[in-house]
């Protein structure tokens, strides 16, 4: 599904991504973790060209995403992206937030778009809020609407960039449950997150990043029980609860 071939990215003299050579399989749930400033968010944003790379090659579903003549808007319409901030259109209702893009970019009729949106809002537990405005929702509810809005385009790939980091602690669980349900449905997902419990329970693989490199790639079982790289060992030691369970 996604291949990184010797990908490099710089911010001035800072080497933000250093020689990334990795692959994400179709249907895989990948969690990317690591300390702040490790390159996690930069990496995920290169997948739909929100961040430009300095060198290397990225392919998504066999498409070189830097190929000349690529219709970037059309390409991005096939990738769902959920950010730290919810980025809902404040002047549109929940339902209209979820129907706008399918009508404009997929050619759905208003009725078709609403039927799809209402089914997705039901899936994330918010069908009863379809007529509400974003300002009337909690942070967790807004993020669930953002997920439903992304899914309304029926993307084969979903990207999550720390989707719970801006939420109050009591709202995190409701968003993670929606993500768990997506993972169980076979969606290809790349998730940048500090939610290690989610990584342990849901991910097929974990990448650990530091200083712009993927230092470790492993199953959750191996990563949490038997981390190989010293930096990964230190990271897990720093985030473990007093009871020795990943936070």
Map each language-model feature to its residues.
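C-terminal boundary and immediately downstream tail of ABC-type ATPase nucleotide-binding domains
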Residues: 217, 221-247
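ABC family nucleotide-binding domain
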Residues: 1-220
């Amino acid at each position: 599904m996604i291949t990184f071939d010797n990908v490099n990215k710089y911010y001035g003299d800072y080497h933000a991504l250093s020689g990334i050579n990795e692959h994400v399989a179709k249907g895989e749930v990948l969690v990317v973790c690591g300390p702040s400033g490790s390159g996690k968010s930069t990496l995920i944003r290169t997948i739909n060209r929100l961040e430009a790379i300095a060198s290397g090659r990225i392919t998504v579903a066999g498409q070189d995403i830097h190929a000349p003549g690529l219709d970037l808007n059309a390409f991005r319409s096939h990738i769902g992206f959920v950010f730290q901030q919810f980025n809902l259109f404040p002047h549109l209702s929940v339902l209209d937030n979820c129907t706008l893009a399918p009508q404009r970019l997929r050619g759905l009729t208003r009725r078709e778009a609403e039927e799809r949106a209402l089914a997705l809002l039901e899936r994330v537990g918010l069908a009863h809020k379809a007529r509400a405005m974003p300002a009337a929702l909690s942070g967790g509810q807004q993020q669930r609407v953002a997920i439903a809005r992304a899914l309304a385009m029926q993307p084969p790939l979903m990207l999550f960039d720390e989707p719970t980091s801006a939420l109050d602690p009591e709202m995190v669980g409701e968003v993670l449950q929606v993500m768990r349900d997506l993972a169980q449905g076979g969606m290809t997902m790349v998730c940048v997150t500090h939610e290690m419990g989610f990584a342990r329970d849901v991910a097929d693989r974990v990448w650990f990043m530091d200083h712009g490199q993927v230092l470790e790639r492993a199953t959750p079982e191996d990563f949490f029980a038997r981390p190989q790289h010293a930096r990964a060992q230190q990271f897990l030691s720093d985030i473990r609860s007093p009871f020795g369970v990943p936070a």
